[in-house]
Structure formats: structure tokens, C-alpha cells
Amino acid sequence: MSYLFTSESVSEGHPDKVSDQISDAILDQFLATDPDSKVACETLVTTGQVVLAGEVKSRSYVDVQETARRVIERIGYTKSEYGFDTRSCGIFSSIHEQSADINRGVDRSDRSEQGAGDQGMMFGYATNETENYMPLTVDLAHHLLYELAAIRKEPSSPMPYLRPDAKSQVTIEHDDEGRPVRIDTIVISTQHDEFVQASDGISEAEADRMMQERIHHDIATILIPRVKMLYKPEIAALFDEKVRLFVNPTGKFVIGGPHGDTGLTGRKIIVDTYGGRASHGGGAFSGKDPSKVDRSAAYAARHIAKNMVAAGVADEMLVQVAYAIGVAEPVSIYVNTKGRSHVALSDGQIAEKIKKIFDMRPYAIEQRLKLRNPIYEETAAYGHFGREPYEAYKTFVDEHGTEQMRIVELFTWEKLDYVDKIRAEFGLS
């Protein structure tokens, strides 16, 4: 029997994502000049104000206020009428030194035996329903907002009224084998200028109706066609005439961003991962250096699941890994192929083979995925998974105010670099 499944995403201008991006930008600045930095940075944003807090152990000096303002400007909060803008917002920092009690459980003279930064369980997931091995619902939700932001930032934008805050939600019908067969509903809520105002000849209700009609038309005729072009024909065909499209269902979305809602680091953990299709251990990613297994082990688990599915071991795979604080080896590795395995092994036996192929000690993960590099700001909006790995030039400022250019490799956990090893281990051709 067919069923409906829904995932959501939020834009880079959503207040929680503003917080995530500031936290990760500060993390990157520390790692750029001291790769051994231990960082846990939390951000709160609200009307006209940014509050930074957290714990750091580093040889670097970072101008956290300047870093936060740069992020806010890049996102697009540059006008005072937004109630939150890069030039006038106040920034308060209460970042302090990391607890020695935590650090003693992590650092080791033999770095390969570095302990996990905390206890907990982390999950990785992959499915072959899309080219990037992500659930289509969340992949489409991300692409809708990524393209909407791109339209907003165009010099001669066809949607010049757009503001930074936005949300999307996608509902897809799946057949009884879990394959997407039809897009049922798309919801887009996007912040906008008040580009039609009540006057002598136009009531407030009429002005609101005119704005909503224009935005709905532009989403349907500008945004949706651009997003369809990103996909192969078989997925683009799921956008049929029966799709229900809701645009700004409340009728108006002028007040938004941190002025409309307070934002906090780590409040969009389902958007950051698999859109609700897979389990989540509860630990957020942003603002955390890779000694925190909440982040590094979740990336490693995704790397495993994606390579296993790409190798043909299963059509779908969930991987759980769990740690004790201060202990290097994980206490457990669990696999669930949801009954869609292509090998004559139990899920427990598959997990044993994973242990042979992948070293899941924290330091080994850091080295394998190059996680001690300043690579995190780019992850903090539009999902940490399903992104294309690439090299980028990034500029950082050292403690002397000198700019440094770095080439870094982003989204290394999305590489399909273990497929051959997996096929050899499982005897797959």
C-alpha cells in the first residue's frame, strides 16, 4: 500500500540557521590557525542582538564579533528594517576555556587512542532513491530553498522582494516498496518586503492578497522550474499538475529572521540530517570540533552507509555507532538494512565486516575524513549530507590581522572512496 512521507528544510536566513552558521564560522577560524583547537560554540540571535557562549581550548585568537558580522552580512541581513542587521546588531561573547576534566578524557600521548569527547549514539543513513543517496523528500526541500536564496542574491533578481528567512516542506507519495511515485504537496514560506501597501484605493487585505498572488506565481513559474532542472527526467516527472502548492499560507511574511523568532545553535538537527527518514542520536553538529563524536561519528556513519549502498550491499542502510566518553573504540556498531540487503548475511554479520573495513576510533575518523581543517561553515545550511565534495579557497584572518588563503576539501564524508574495498570484502562484482 502506498504512503505519504514529509520532510522540511529551512533557509540560511532562518534564525536557527543563522546561529548554526555563526557557530561554525567561529569554529573554522579557530581550526584555521590551530588545527588542534577544542571548540564548543553556541549562538543565540534575536532582535538586534547576538549572544555567543561556549568553551574553547586553543592557541588561536579569533575576533568572534567580526566573524559573526561577516556571516550575518553574507546571509543578507544588511538592512535596518529587518530588525536585525550586520552593522547595528549588538554582539555579546561569553566564550571561556574548556573544562580540564573533559580535556583529560580526550587527549592522549598516543593520538590514535584519543578518547571520544562524550558518550552517545550517532546514526548514518543512505538510500538509493536519489543520485546522492539521500531521501528525496529532504533533498528536494533543501534544493527549493537553496535555489530560492540564489534567486534572491541575483543582481537583477526576478523576485526582488525576497528577504533571507524561508522554510520549505515536501510531501511525497511512495509505493509499497518505498519508491517515490508522486510529489503530493510543496509548502514554501518565504519572508518578503511589503512591496504592496495599503493606500486610499487599496485596503490592507487587498494589499496582502496582491502580494501573496505575486509570490505564489513567482514560486510556481520561476523557482519550481529551476529546481526541476536539477533532477533527472524520472524525478522531474514527479512534479505533475496534481501537486498541491502552498505559498505563505498565513498570507503575509514580512517580519522574520531573528527579529521574528529567536534562533539557537543546534535546533534543526532533523533538517541537518535525513529529514526524519532515519534515526537521530540527539546531538547537534554546529559549533563542535571533531573531537565531539556527535559530529565526527555521525559524518563517519554517513560515509559508511553511503559507500555500502553504492557498493550494492543494500538498497538502504542505517548505521548506528555508540561511544563512552574518554574511550577510543566504539562500544557498539549496529546495522539495519530494512530488509533490502543484497548479500547472504545478517545485519549483525554486515556490522562485523564494517568493523574490519572502517576504523571508528575518533582520531582515525578525523584523519580519514580530514576533519581538522576549517570546513564547517559550508555545512551549516541546506544539510550536512547529500552535498557534492569539492575543494574551495577560503580566507581566514590570523591573530595579527593578516589574511591567510587556504585550500580545503569540503564534504569529504560524501566521497564514494570505499566502494571497491567493500565490494572486495563482500565478494560483490
From Swiss-Prot:
GO CC field: cytoplasm
Enzyme class name: transferase
Region of interest called Flexible loop, as start-end residue ranges on this chain: 98-108
UniProt xrefs under NCBIfam families: metK
Predominant place of localization: cytoplasm
Signal peptide annotation: none
Cofactor binding comment, as recorded: Binds 2 divalent ions per subunit.
Gene: metK
Ligand binding (K(+)): E42
Family: Belongs to the AdoMet synthase family.
Binding site for ATP: H14, D165, A166, K167, K252, F253, D261, R267, K268, A284, K288
Binding site for Mg(2+): D16
EC number: 2.5.1.6
Protein name: S-adenosylmethionine synthase
Pathway stated in the Swiss-Prot or TrEMBL entry: Amino-acid biosynthesis; S-adenosyl-L-methionine biosynthesis; S-adenosyl-L-methionine from L-methionine: step 1/1
Statement: the UniProt record of this protein carries the keyword Lipid metabolism: no
A Pfam family recorded for this sequence: S-AdoMet_synt_N
Binding-site residues for L-methionine, renumbered to this chain: E55, Q98, D261, K292
Subcellular location: Cytoplasm
Subunit architecture: Homotetramer; dimer of dimers.
GO biological process: one-carbon metabolic process; S-adenosylmethionine biosynthetic process
Essential cofactor(s): Mg(2+); K(+)
GO MF annotation list: ATP binding; magnesium ion binding; methionine adenosyltransferase activity
Species this chain originates from: Porphyromonas gingivalis (strain ATCC BAA-308 / W83)
Catalytic activity: L-methionine + ATP + H2O = S-adenosyl-L-methionine + phosphate + diphosphate
PROSITE patterns assigned: ADOMET_SYNTHASE_1 (PS00376), ADOMET_SYNTHASE_2 (PS00377)
Keywords: ATP-binding, Cytoplasm, Magnesium, Metal-binding, Nucleotide-binding, One-carbon metabolism, Potassium, Transferase
